[in-house]
Amino acid sequence: MEKVPEKITLGLLQHACDPNPAQNLDYALNAAKNAAEAGAQIICTQELFASQYFCQSETHEHFDLAEPIPGPKTTAFQELARTEGVVIVASLFEKRAAGLYHNSAVIIDADGSLLGTYRKMHIPDDPLYYEKFYFTPGDQGFRAWDTAYGRIGVLICWDQWFPEAARLTALAGAELILSPTAIGWHPAEKDAEGKAQHAAWQTIQRGHAI
């Protein structure tokens, strides 16, 4: 691994998702390219960027959105990482085997190599967040990967509410933890609970840093 620079520039991608997965992929790739050209060295997509958040219902047809890792989306981000010389963390709906699906993220180094995959461990099952219908909890533990710009770990969305997830990732040597997220509020809760929940989230993240 090359000497890690003292300062790292992050590119964090966020966008409204179109019903067309191909359009979302094109948007994310273009946004990542723009971020790289603006100086980003590590780029992270939002959680499940390639589709609208489908876990609001339990619908079997949504499994068609999943793809293997590596697959077409992984390959597209590998090519971008290699061309732009950036590290990329991209969140994907993974089809691991027949009947076995994960909410995953691929970790791609600046030379385009696929370093590994993180699979979301903590899976919510609340009104409008029926993720247990779709995702099997990850079975790889909490890990970290050496990249061109430091040793990074990955958590996904609800994982970041659990202190031990960040602690174990840090114990694996992570200098930076990235958390692709599609977090939100139930519409009936946002006005009454939104500010308090946001403050609680900030407190949790500060605890992770400590």
Model-flagged regions — what are they?
Residues 56-64, 126-127, 186-193:
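Short glycine/proline- and charge-enriched loop/turn segments
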Residues 22-29, 70-71:
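Glycine-rich anion/phosphate-binding loops
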Residues 66-89, 157-210:
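CN hydrolase (nitrilase-like) catalytic-core segments centered on the catalytic cysteine
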Residues 2-10, 144-153, 176:
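Beta-strand-turn-beta hairpins that frame and shape the catalytic cleft
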Residues 64-154, 205-210:
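Catalytic-core segment of enzymes that process non-peptidic bonds
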Residues 10, 24, 32-61, 81, ...:
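Active-site beta-strand/loop signature of hydrolases that rely on acidic residues for catalysis
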Residues 14-19:
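Short polar catalytic/cofactor-binding loops
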